[in-house]
Amino acid sequence: MRLLDDLQAGLAAIDAAHLRRVRRTAYSPTDRSQRISVPGEAPRDILGFCGNDYLGLAAHPALVEAMTQGTQQYGFGSGASHLVSGHSIAHARLEARMAALQGEHIPEADALFFCTGYMANLAVVSAMAQAGGIRPAEECTIFSDALNHASLIDGARLSRAPIKVYPHVDLAALEALLAASTSRNKLIVTDGVFSMDGDIAPLPELLALAERYDAWLIVDDAHGLGVLGENGAGVLSHFGLHSQRIIYVGTFGKAAGGSGAAIVGHRLVIDWLVQRARTYIFTTATPPGIACAVEAALDLIASEEGDERRARLDRHIAVWSAHAQRLAARFGWQWMPSPTAIQPIVIGENAPALALAAALEHEGIRIAAIRPPTVPAGTARLRITLSAAHTDADIERLAQALEAAGQSLQPAKAA
């Protein structure tokens, strides 16, 4: 069969380029260390530096209890989409909580809860490109950072609006594109914290451009909510921004430890999304127990315990940054300084990045080797992510293991 032959050839090409992805199976709750297996091997305990559980909340007893109680109260499933009969009071409470949280930064804010961050980003970009029923191909232009998350890129593509990609955080290039645009509506789309580099978008400058050129600013704060800003309120709080032009996407699958996402914007923006966001309209609502757990996670994030966890994470970032800078200089890698939990070290080609990741996993440490197309060709990297759940000893163990792996694989440079 020709299709299967084509698939086999495509998979062979993926293997030849060292780009095959392999799933691992976890046998224990998400934590700093998990019991994990890879295909063909028995499960074993692995110390993880590759997840997004930045505050160590994924298995927090209070959140497990909140989900259990919510499920007991409202049942397992929602039974329908939000616009039919699946919109629970648990969903409504969470939306009100997010609207209040970001309402300090977005006047007349309302919020809309989605099953995943990916679905939220598909919705906000594609639906806002058709705001008010305009023809997106003729009356809206999307301005997208070159390193935006795949979900923002896909949302732009689905919108059928023209897309102008500007070099990563290049404000001059973006301004030139905005100045040349004659579109009725303009959408500037950006990650708040970039998922592969760990840098924070220059949101004050982006908002200034949005105001100057009558554009809207869509911010995906997947990696900022919970860890940045006052009481972990996110990247808008981090910068102290305030504008009706901001549309905010907060994701609950990272620092909040759960799943789902909420879009926060002016009440008319949210009402439009209810009417036109296909990934909201045409899917079963998230189980209400998850909404209950996420609301409890937001409580915990804003609490004294949340402050303590953020402080611990910040200490880990400072200690690890010193190790990473030293190791990168020793082995000829590129250290990418980041003030966030995302701490990438660029190795370059795919094969050595995979070899380093394999050597670390052999020693019981899991770090993802990120390769194209997730990152540009020639920038394969170890994407190290830190968590408040890690201990000081974990950070030292990682530094020692990475140094040993680098020395064994690159003895000439290590001399």
Curated annotation (Swiss-Prot):
**GO biological process: one example:** biotin biosynthetic process
- Which amino acids does the record list as binding substrate? 21, 149, 374
Q: Which residues bind pyridoxal 5'-phosphate?
A: 117-118, 195, 223, 251
Question: What EC number(s) are associated with this protein in UniProt?
Answer: 2.3.1.47
Entry keyword Transferase? yes
Question: What's the top EC group for this one?
Answer: transferase
What InterPro entries is this protein classified in? Answer: Aminotransferase_I/II_large, AON_synthase_class-II, AONS_Archaea/Proteobacteria, AONS_Proteobacteria, PyrdxlP-dep_Trfase, PyrdxlP-dep_Trfase_major, PyrdxlP-dep_Trfase_small
Q: Which GO terms describe its molecular function?
A: 8-amino-7-oxononanoate synthase activity; pyridoxal phosphate binding
Give the catalytic activity: 6-carboxyhexanoyl-[ACP] + L-alanine + H(+) = (8S)-8-amino-7-oxononanoate + holo-[ACP] + CO2
Q: Which domain of life is it from?
A: Bacteria
Which cofactor is essential here? Answer: pyridoxal 5'-phosphate
Is Transferase given among the entry's keywords? yes
Keywords, A to Z, come to: Biotin biosynthesis, Pyridoxal phosphate, Transferase
> What pathway is it annotated to?
Cofactor biosynthesis; biotin biosynthesis
Q: Which family does it belong to?
A: Belongs to the class-II pyridoxal-phosphate-dependent aminotransferase family. BioF subfamily.
Q: How does it assemble?
A: Homodimer.
Report the protein's function: Catalyzes the decarboxylative condensation of pimeloyl-[acyl-carrier protein] and L-alanine to produce 8-amino-7-oxononanoate (AON), [acyl-carrier protein], and carbon dioxide.
What is the name attached to this protein's record? 8-amino-7-oxononanoate synthase
Q: Which gene encodes it?
A: bioF
